[in-house]
């Protein structure tokens, strides 16, 4: 299970040794060792809120997801948020409580997750954990069975959120989530294409298989919209990045047709 590890790792030299070791073990997906390190850190300083946050995440990272482990994490996170909802640990706790409601709980609560993400973005918009919440919020809002007018209101909410995002990864993921929902659920290439193009233009889509998928989708959307030179550029980019991909032969044919059409 992926865990987003943020603030405690950015001040490595200043961290107490056991707390630092705990976060390092979490980053290596070693929850038992992380829990041991955080227990030692808390024995030395029971008020260490970042070690308490780490201990909660170690429960969530256990390979065996059980109601007991999720409940243990939830209790630690609730206490952190209740004591102080404005420091790094309290804001992190709010984020992970929303994640529990969305994906970790054995009885997921979409409404609680939505409320948690919205509250983070409203109260702490520039905080890294709030930025992480943005694409999660988009996913929950857009992939829900709601009437068309409500779905459009949700699209508008995400569109209004995008200019407030400052973390490149959060901006990329939120744009891509919206773009793919527009295509998959509405076949709305006109609104989706600028989102795809902006991500590719910013150079923030780098890893396979995401780059593979986004290049093909941007090319297809551009082609459908009659932007043939842009479609050809994306197809050519794809072939340069992934010459041996299983789709390469078909992409070459599509590129050839566009080039032939442009040069009769």
Predicted features along the sequence, with ranges:
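TPR/TPR-like (Sel1-like) alpha-helical repeat modules
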Residues: 114-123, 135-138, 228-246, 253-256
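Structural motif corresponding to the intra-repeat A-B loop/turn of tetratricopeptide repeats
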Residues: 28, 62, 67, 104-107, ...
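TPR repeat positional signature
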Residues: 18, 52, 56-59, 94-97, ...
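Residue-level recognition of tetratricopeptide repeat
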Residues: 23, 57, 61, 99-102, ...
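N-terminal leader/linker segments that initiate helical-solenoid repeat arrays
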Residues: 2, 6-64, 68-71, 88, ...
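Short solvent-exposed coil/turn linkers within tandem alpha-helical repeat scaffolds
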Residues: 41-51, 80-91, 106-107, 121-132, ...
């Amino acid at each position: 299970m992926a865990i987003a590890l943020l603030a405690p790792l950015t001040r490595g030299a200043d961290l107490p040794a056991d707390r630092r070791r705990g976060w390092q073990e979490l980053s290596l997906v070693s929850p038992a060792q992380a829990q041991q390190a955080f227990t030692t850190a808390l024995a030395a300083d029971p008020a260490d809120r970042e070690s308490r946050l780490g201990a909660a995440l170690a429960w969530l990272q256990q390979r065996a997801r059980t109601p007991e482990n999720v409940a243990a994490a939830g209790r630690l996170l609730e206490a952190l948020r209740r004591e102080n909802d404005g420091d790094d640990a309290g804001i992190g706790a709010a984020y992970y409580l929303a994640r529990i409601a969305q994906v970790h709980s054995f009885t997921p609560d979409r409404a609680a997750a939505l409320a948690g993400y919205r509250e983070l973005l409203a109260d702490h918009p520039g905080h890294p954990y709030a930025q992480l919440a943005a694409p999660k919020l988009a996913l929950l809002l857009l992939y829900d069975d709601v009437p068309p007018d409500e779905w459009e209101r949700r699209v508008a909410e995400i569109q209004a959120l995008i200019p407030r995002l400052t973390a490149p990864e959060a901006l990329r993921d939120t744009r891509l989530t919206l773009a793919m929902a527009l295509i998959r659920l509405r076949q709305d290439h006109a609104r989706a294409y600028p989102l795809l193009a902006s991500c590719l233009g910013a150079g923030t889509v780098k890893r396979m298989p995401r780059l593979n998928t986004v290049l093909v989708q941007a090319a297809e959307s551009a082609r459908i919209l009659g932007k043939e030179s842009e479609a050809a550029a994306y197809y050519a980019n794809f072939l340069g990045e992934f010459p041996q991909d299983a789709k390469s032969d078909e992409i070459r044919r599509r590129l050839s047709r566009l080039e032939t059409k442009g040069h009769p």
